[in-house]
């Protein structure tokens, strides 16, 4: 008959490698779910539509808005690219007309353009930004997902297309 110390020793000899193998399997398994990121199709702001003005909804202040940065994280799929767009906008207001909280809604349009320079689809996003009390700038970060067909590009614009 084996003593308790022998049983513990045998258990530890078996349990430790199994525990280590289990931890490694979890780590390897988690990394298997991470997609393989690649190069994004061209994504840029349309000349003349990268800056605009709008009116705030609380105080009626004139707000200047412009793109402050556009980047993407893309995964190639069968016939298209799954793109996650990171869009940063910079908004400024004049505090001489009031410094209380201000709110503004604005549109961003993403046009998918093919190799013949034809707009094949358009997606418009309504966004909202706030100015805190006594703050003259606001920098909302926007994340949007788009499916971009192979051979196409994305052109972003502030505002929306006339219907």
Specify the residue positions occupied by each region the protein language model found:
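Bacterial signal peptide processing site
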Residues: 31-34
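C-terminal motif of bacterial Sec signal peptides marking the signal peptidase cleavage site
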Residues: 26-29
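Bacterial N-terminal signal peptides that target proteins for export
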Residues: 3-19
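Generic short beta-strand segments
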Residues: 68-71, 86-92, 161
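Short, solvent-exposed beta-strand/turn "edge" segments of beta-rich domains on protein surfaces
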Residues: 59-63, 71-84, 95-102, 145-147
């Amino acid at each position: 008959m084996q003593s308790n110390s022998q049983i513990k020793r045998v258990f530890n000899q078996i349990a430790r490698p199994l525990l280590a193998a289990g931890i490694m399997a979890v780590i390897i398994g988690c990394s298997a779910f991470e997609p393989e990121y690649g190069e994004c199709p061209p994504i840029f702001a349309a000349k003349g539509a990268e800056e605009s003005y709008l009116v705030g909804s609380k105080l009626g202040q004139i707000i200047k808005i412009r793109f402050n940065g556009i980047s993407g994280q893309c995964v190639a799929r069968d016939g298209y690219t799954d793109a996650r767009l990171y869009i940063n906008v910079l908004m400024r207001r004049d505090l001489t007309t009031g410094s209380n909280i201000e709110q503004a809604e604005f549109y961003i349009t993403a046009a998918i353009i093919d190799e013949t320079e034809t707009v094949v689809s358009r997606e418009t996003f309504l966004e909202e930004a706030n100015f805190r009390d006594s703050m003259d700038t606001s920098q909302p970060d926007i994340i949007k997902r788009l499916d971009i067909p192979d051979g196409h590009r994305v052109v972003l614009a502030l505002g929306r297309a006339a219907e």
